[in-house]
Amino acid sequence: TNTPEDDRYLQDYVYI
């Protein structure tokens, strides 16, 4: 279970 914040953080991390 991931929260929108965690998901957003993961997206940014992968994008970099």
Curated annotation (Swiss-Prot):
GO molecular function: metal ion binding; metallopeptidase activity; toxin activity
Signal peptide: none
Activity control, per UniProt: Inhibited by EDTA and EGTA, but not by PMSF and leupeptin.
Peptidase M12B domain span: 14-16
Keyword Protease: yes
Post-translational modification: Glycosylated.
EC number(s) stated in the UniProt entry for this protein: 3.4.24.-
Cofactor(s) recorded in Swiss-Prot or TrEMBL: Zn(2+)
Tissue: Expressed by the venom gland.
Biological process, per Gene Ontology: proteolysis
Keyword Secreted found: yes
Location in or out of the cell: Secreted
Superkingdom of source: Eukaryota
Cofactor mode of binding and number, as noted: Binds 1 zinc ion per subunit.
Its biological purpose: Snake venom zinc metalloprotease that causes mast cell degranulation and histamine release. Selectively degrades the alpha-chain of human fibrinogen (FGA).
Complexes and interactors: Monomer.
Family: Belongs to the venom metalloproteinase (M12B) family. P-III subfamily. P-IIIa sub-subfamily.
Protein's recorded name: Zinc metalloproteinase atrahagin
Organism taxonomic ancestry: Eukaryota, Metazoa, Chordata, Craniata, Vertebrata
